[in-house]
Every structure is written in C-alpha cells, then in structure tokens.
C-alpha cells in the first residue's frame, strides 16, 4: 500500500505509543506515552515556551516538567492528554493528515464500553478520519505470530493480560488481568537498588532505572539456585554507568527484579504470578480447546523481553498442567512490537476492508456502532 492512502496503525500502550503505516513490518514511530507540563513559570519572555510537551520532547525536558501518563493499566484515564498524544502521533511523528487515512487503534482486553465509544468519537469528530477500527491488542499479537488460536500472555508497561483466543475470537469470560507490569518492576528495582545504597527517587531517575532494567535484568530458571550462585561468587555482577559518570554494580537485583512476575508477593501483592494466571485462564476455557491453548502460548509485549522468561514459563506451566500435555511457549523475537505488527497485517488484508467503520456509518449510528462492528 502507498503511504498516501495506507491505513494508519496506532498501538497506544501505557508506556509507549507505537505508530506507523499498514503493510510496514515495523512501526515508524515509537515514543513514550507521556504529556509533560512545566513545573515552573517561564522566566525567559518570548522564548515561545509551550504549555505542554509530548513524547520524547517531554522525556528530554523531564527535569523542568511534571510528567503524566494518560493511559493507566492499559486503559485511557485522561482524554484531553490522550487527544494530545494522538495529535502528536499524526502531525509530528507520522506527518499525515488523519482525515485522509483510515485509522486502526488498539485497546486493552476488557476495555470499558464507554472508552471504545469515546475513542471512536474523537477519531471521527476531532480528527475527521474517513474510517476507523478498534482491535484488541492480544488478538493482534496472535495474528502476528501466524495463529488464530492460542493464549496470549501480553505484558507491557502498565498491565498484564492473559487472553485465550479461539479461531480469531477472544474468549472474554476467560481473560484475566494482572495489574503488575513493567512500571511496577522498574519501581521495584528502584527500591532494591536503594537498599544497596544508590538513591533513585524522581520521575527522571526512574527512567535511568528503567534503562538498567532493560539492559541488565533476566529471569532465573531456578530462583533459589540463582540466589545461591549470586551469594557465593561475583560471576553474575554487572556494572552500569550513570549519566553523571558514576558506575554502579548490580548483582542479584538483576534477576530479583523480574522474579516478581512469578512471585508478586515480592511487591506486596497477593495476586498469582504470570504462570499461574496463564494456567487459570486456560482452565476457564472449554475442556476441548485447552490442548490447543497449552500448545500455543504466545508471549507479547515489552515486559516479556527478559532473557530466560520463555524457559521459565515452560517449566512453571509444565508443573501446573496435566503431565501428558504438550506445552509450547512461543516468544517471537519482535514481540515488543507484535501488537503493532498484527495491526499492520490486519489493516492491509483485502478481506478486512469491509470491516472498517466508515464516517457515514458513524454519522448514522453514533459512537455505539463500535460495539457492532469491532469485536
């Protein structure tokens, strides 16, 4: 498809917004889902200071801004800021006129009905898009892996979901949500590094810790054994240079941080770990399809990028499932963007073209059309 008529695919995550053109194999723009407002009154008259900044610009000026995330736990909670993010996506990142392109948006599983309607309304009334569609994130990840049946464990920055999908349809009664994801792990790493005597407190310093997490953390296959190894030798230690030149060393924190995915009690949470949540989700499904779900367990989202996570999931789910069950964990290398990639695939299918909600249909039926056309 040509860029001039190609559909736009926008995956709005709690942490990052991924946007680009249908038919591409990767998003053109990936930027933080952040809106920042100045903390102090501007002193330089005529500097043309803005009253708000979005994405990378907000990130780079974080020292003088108060940063807000309009998407919490995968669900939009601040529509004015969300509109700013979409505006930034179309006009500054993709440099397109939204009134000339169909737009595919993604939503969290179990997104409230009112939210889908609000998204639809903003697209048609604020941005005047000719057509739009809202797709469930986990379903897109499954498409991106070349499947229509399986269970997706999608874990991003703000929320983790386990979503069983059969023949392309998500099974809502069996979807489970876990409010434990990347941001919680970053906060936990901040806490355990503080115990080491390093101080990280501000929102700006949190971004440094996020970088440490992404570069150095991994999931242990056997947590107790790894703890013993870390205690008896320095083989697991790695160093990291902070922006000010100070070098810090991190040891067992490297695997203690993501261990919280399997043992949420580390964060003082009573919920089940991601392995049990996946198992519970499968058990809520019809007995006849469980075999297909066990054999097609797909990992998706940035928080599944830790080295070692697939092997650990395999081990934990094997321990929970019936002993004869074949279990396969699929961890595609591009899983950080698999929701977006699935959207790109879907929006460029010829069979999908009749699925779009057109401006005409919206004008006739109003925002509730989204429940009839997008499922």
Curated annotation (Swiss-Prot):
GO terms for biological process: adherens junction assembly; apical protein localization; axonogenesis; cell motility; cellular response to cytochalasin B; chromatin remodeling; cytoskeleton organization; establishment or maintenance of cell polarity. The modification Methionine (R)-sulfoxide is found at residues 44, 47. The modification N-acetylaspartate is found at residue 2. Its EC number is 3.6.4.-. Changing residue 81 to A: Decreased interaction with SETD3. Its main location: cytoplasm. Changing residue 146 to D: In CSMH; somatic variant. The modification Tele-methylhistidine is found at residue 73. Keywords: Acetylation, ATP-binding, Cytoplasm, Cytoskeleton, Deafness, Disease variant, Dystonia, Hydrolase, Intellectual disability, Isopeptide bond, Methylation, Nucleotide-binding, Nucleus, Oxidation, Ubl conjugation. One of its GO terms (cellular component) is RSC-type complex. ISGylated. GO terms for molecular function: ATP binding; ATP hydrolysis activity; identical protein binding; kinesin binding; nitric-oxide synthase binding; nitric-oxide synthase regulator activity; protein kinase binding; structural constituent of cytoskeleton. Changing residue 313 to R: In THC8; uncertain significance. There is a cross-link at residue 50 ((Microbial infection) Isoglutamyl lysine isopeptide (Lys-Glu) (interchain with E-270)). InterPro entries: Actin, Actin/actin-like_CS, Actin_CS, ATPase_NBD. In vertebrates 3 main groups of actin isoforms, alpha, beta and gamma have been identified. The alpha actins are found in muscle tissues and are a major constituent of the contractile apparatus. The beta and gamma actins coexist in most cell types as components of the cytoskeleton and as mediators of internal cell motility. It is linked to Dystonia-deafness syndrome 1: An autosomal dominant form of dystonia with juvenile onset, associated with congenital or childhood-onset sensorineural deafness. Dystonia is defined by the presence of sustained involuntary muscle contraction, often leading to abnormal postures. Some DDS1 patients have dysmorphic features, skeletal anomalies, and/or mild developmental delay with impaired intellectual development. Baraitser-Winter syndrome 1: A rare developmental disorder characterized by the combination of congenital ptosis, high-arched eyebrows, hypertelorism, ocular colobomata, and a brain malformation consisting of anterior-predominant lissencephaly. Other typical features include postnatal short stature and microcephaly, intellectual disability, seizures, and hearing loss. Actin is a highly conserved protein that polymerizes to produce filaments that form cross-linked networks in the cytoplasm of cells. Actin exists in both monomeric (G-actin) and polymeric (F-actin) forms, both forms playing key functions, such as cell motility and contraction. In addition to their role in the cytoplasmic cytoskeleton, G- and F-actin also localize in the nucleus, and regulate gene transcription and motility and repair of damaged DNA. Belongs to the actin family. This is Actin, cytoplasmic 1. It comes from Homo sapiens. The gene is ACTB.
């Amino acid at each position: 498809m040509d860029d001039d008529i190609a559909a736009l695919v926008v995956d709005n995550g709690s942490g990052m917004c991924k946007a680009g053109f249908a038919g591409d194999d990767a998003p053109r723009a990936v930027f933080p889902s952040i809106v920042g407002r100045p903390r102090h009154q501007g002193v330089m008259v005529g500097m043309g200071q803005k009253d708000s900044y979005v994405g990378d610009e907000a990130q780079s000026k974080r020292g003088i801004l108060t940063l807000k995330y309009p998407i919490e736990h995968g669900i939009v909670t601040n529509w004015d800021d969300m509109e700013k993010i979409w505006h930034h996506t179309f006009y500054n990142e993709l440099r397109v006129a939204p009134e000339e392109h169909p737009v595919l948006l993604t939503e969290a599983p179990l997104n409230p009905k009112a939210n889908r309607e609000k998204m639809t309304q903003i697209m048609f009334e604020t941005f005047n898009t000719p057509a739009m569609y809202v797709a469930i994130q986990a379903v897109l990840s499954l498409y991106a892996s070349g499947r229509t049946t399986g269970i997706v464990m999608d874990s991003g920055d703000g929320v983790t979901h386990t979503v069983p999908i059969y023949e392309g349809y998500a099974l809502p009664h069996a979807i489970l949500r876990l409010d434990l994801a990347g941001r919680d792990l970053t906060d936990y790493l901040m806490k355990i590094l503080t115990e080491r005597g390093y101080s990280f407190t501000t929102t700006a310093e949190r971004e440094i810790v996020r970088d440490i997490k992404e570069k150095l953390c991994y999931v242990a296959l056997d947590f107790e054994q790894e703890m013993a190894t870390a205690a008896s030798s320095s083989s697991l230690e790695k160093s990291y240079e902070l922006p000010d030149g100070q070098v810090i060393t991190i040891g067992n924190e490297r695997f203690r941080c993501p261990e919280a995915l399997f043992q949420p009690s580390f964060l003082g949470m009573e919920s089940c770990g991601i392995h049990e949540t996946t198992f519970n989700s499968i058990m809520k499904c019809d007995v006849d399809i469980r075999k297909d779900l066990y054999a097609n367990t797909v990992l998706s989202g940035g928080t599944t990028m830790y080295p070692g996570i697939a092997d650990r999931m395999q081990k934990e789910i094997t321990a929970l499932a019936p002993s004869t069950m074949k279990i396969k964990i699929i961890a595609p290398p591009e899983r950080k963007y698999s929701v977006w990639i699935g959207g790109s695939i879907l929006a460029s299918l010829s069979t999908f073209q009749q699925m779009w909600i057109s401006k005409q249909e919206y004008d006739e039926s109003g925002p509730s059309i989204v429940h009839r056309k997008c499922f």
